[in-house]
Amino acid sequence: MLVISNVYPSNLFTLINPFFAKLPEAYAIFDPIVDVMPIIPVFFFLLAFVWQAAVSFR
């Protein structure tokens, strides 16, 4: 496995750290949407608490 990871050292950094990954140029207009997408599950988690508060935590 060590040999395989050393074959492409320039791509290894982007595979380990996805925060620095870039979208292809054709999809650059979707970059702001892609930045917000990981937060969407947190909104559903918070919505569950709001929903339970609305029904008095039954």
From Swiss-Prot:
Pfam family, one: PsbK
Protein location: Plastid, Chloroplast thylakoid membrane
Ranges that cross the membrane: 29-49
Propeptide section residues: 1-21
GO cellular component: chloroplast thylakoid membrane; photosystem II reaction center
Membrane-topology descriptor: Single-pass membrane protein
Keywords: Chloroplast, Membrane, Photosynthesis, Photosystem II, Plastid, Reaction center, Thylakoid, Transmembrane, Transmembrane helix
UniProt-listed GO biological process terms: photosynthesis
Domain of life: Eukaryota
Principal place of residence: plastid
Membership in a protein family: Belongs to the PsbK family.
Assembly description: PSII is composed of 1 copy each of membrane proteins PsbA, PsbB, PsbC, PsbD, PsbE, PsbF, PsbH, PsbI, PsbJ, PsbK, PsbL, PsbM, PsbT, PsbX, PsbY, PsbZ, Psb30/Ycf12, at least 3 peripheral proteins of the oxygen-evolving complex and a large number of cofactors. It forms dimeric complexes.
Function: One of the components of the core complex of photosystem II (PSII). PSII is a light-driven water:plastoquinone oxidoreductase that uses light energy to abstract electrons from H(2)O, generating O(2) and a proton gradient subsequently used for ATP formation. It consists of a core antenna complex that captures photons, and an electron transfer chain that converts photonic excitation into a charge separation.
Protein name: Photosystem II reaction center protein K
